Amino acid sequence: MSFNGEKPKPIPESIKDPADMSVNRSNTTQARDILKQDEGGNMNMSLAEMEKHLKTLRLHGMIATLETRIVQANQGASFTEVFACLIQDELDYRKSRLTQTRLKASGLTEQPTLTEFDWGFNPKLPKMDIYELVSGKFIREGHDALLIGSPGTGKSMIAKTVANAAILAGYKVVYREAHTFFEDLFEATQLKRRKKISKLFSETDLLIIDDLFLRKKMPEQAADDLLEIILNRYSAKKSTLLTSNRLVEDWGKLLRDNTASSAILDRLLHHGHLLKFEGKSYRLKEAASRISQSKQKKQDEKGKNMDLSKEDL
């Protein structure tokens, strides 16, 4: 293995990606053999020693691909090519770990994408506006979004899709269903941790409150709690996305505080995107599909039983 500055041979396409390595022996065996051959030459450190030192330096991404990169070097890649690959491996590893950490911290339990969305079922949905939300442009601009419409029209799925896309883009996101949002604030107040949860809700890059007013009876402090967080986020130019099946004109009555409701909507709509969701319910569609499949299954089983009975005769 030589890193002496000679013109490197191109890395074969089949081994550029560690996942695509096509060799007769394992990378571990090859890497150890290569390093053993180099003893007394350019390299005096064993594979185990390299991994130990990389672990001390917490370069776990490099550890994961070290064996593959040694094989690549032996097959003609230059020092700079291999080292660049190792650096990129570490960066990719850290980005992946950070993304997983943020997904877990967000409260999001699923990762939907727009490729899963059935646009044909509800053709009246604001498709272009939805794509713009998922692009994250409104987060970069510090704007807000309200998704208003009938139950089952896709508001929650779009909200979760926006959350997932934002996390993958590197943003910190907090997703809460409305009742959980208010419960978190109430419990934190009782446990004297209000400041901590308020800071979390106020400072995250994107706060999503899903299904606001789904429950008819709102907590007594709902208006004050929501107003506090929205005012904090508005001042900090942090983006908030809310979904609800209730018209904004009804929010004052539902919150039992017209003044607070007006202040909340004033901030949300100042630089806000109001998307109306109209059409049929995706949930009812899925329920109808399940019922149909169940009926078909029963009919098929009944047919099989009849055939077996005829055979017995």
Model-derived features: where do they sit?
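Intrinsically disordered, low-complexity and often Lys/Arg-enriched segments
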Residues: 1-52, 199, 291-313
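N-terminal pre-Walker A segment at the start of P-loop NTPase domains
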Residues: 112-134
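Interdomain "pre-motor" coupling segment immediately N-terminal to P-loop NTPase/helicase cores
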Residues: 55-56, 60-110
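Residue-level preference for the first positions of well-ordered beta-strands
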Residues: 144-146, 206, 239-241
